[in-house]
């Protein structure tokens, strides 16, 4: 049985929109969802200046990467910000309270920071059901070894992005139900 639901696809295709549709619906139904997301941040002229890491419950955020002002390892045009590791690690303290762990995204930027990468590894090893948005070319062998055999994968395209939210929702709902030892999740 699948305990992880994985969403992937090209940049800009609608992965984050799908993620939020599913997460909001689950939260509205009383599912306790913990995790984080990494939105882009645009400057006054409209160009991207970096990314933040934000806890789903809104209780914390930090810069994940910026064009300037951070001193961590570089990924493309951005320098990672070590303070993101503290925010990511707070998810570990919430594992016991969560019905589902949701992360958007697991990609090069997030994995470049050792503390964020360790948090993701520990989440995957926790046995908690998860909804994960992953970079289309994710190549981390540790993560793939856990997601491939125990995950159901959805590849988002422009053609299917309008029908996938319900399919992803159903898959996540069943993963949560199985973790609670029930066949159907009645919310």
Swiss-Prot record:
Binding site for ATP: 9-16, 100-107
Keyword Lipid biosynthesis: no
Function: Has nucleotide phosphatase activity towards ATP, GTP, CTP, TTP and UTP. May hydrolyze nucleoside diphosphates with lower efficiency.
SUPFAM superfamilies, per database record: P-loop containing nucleoside triphosphate hydrolases (SSF52540)
This protein's UniProt keywords: ATP-binding, Hydrolase, Nucleotide-binding
Record's catalysed reaction(s): a ribonucleoside 5'-triphosphate + H2O = a ribonucleoside 5'-diphosphate + phosphate + H(+)
A molecular-function term among this protein's GO annotations: ATP binding
Annotated organism of origin: Hyperthermus butylicus (strain DSM 5456 / JCM 9403 / PLM1-5)
Pfam annotation, one family: NTPase_1
EC number, as in UniProt: 3.6.1.15
Family designation: Belongs to the THEP1 NTPase family.
Full protein name: Nucleoside-triphosphatase THEP1
């Amino acid at each position: 049985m699948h305990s992880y639901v994985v969403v992937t696809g090209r940049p800009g295709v609608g992965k984050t929109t799908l993620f939020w549709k599913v997460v909001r619906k689950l939260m509205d139904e009383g599912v306790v969802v913990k995790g984080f997301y990494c939105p882009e941040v645009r400057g006054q002229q409209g160009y991207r200046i970096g990314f933040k890491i934000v806890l789903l419950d809104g209780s914390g955020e930090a810069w994940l990467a910026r064009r300037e002002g951070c001193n961590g390892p570089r990924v493309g045009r951005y320098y990672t910000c070590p303070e993101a590791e503290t925010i990511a690690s707070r998810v570990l303290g919430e594992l016991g309270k969560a019905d589902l762990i949701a992360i958007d995204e697991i990609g090069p930027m997030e994995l470049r920071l050792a503390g964020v990468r360790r948090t993701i590894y520990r989440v995957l090893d926790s046995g908690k059901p998860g909804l994960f948005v992953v970079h289309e070319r994710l190549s981390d062998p540790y993560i793939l070894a856990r997601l491939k055999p125990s995950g159901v994968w959805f590849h988002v395209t422009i053609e299917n992005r309008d029908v996938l939210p319900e399919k992803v929702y159903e898959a996540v709902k069943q993963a949560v139900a199985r973790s609670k030892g029930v066949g159907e999740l009645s919310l």
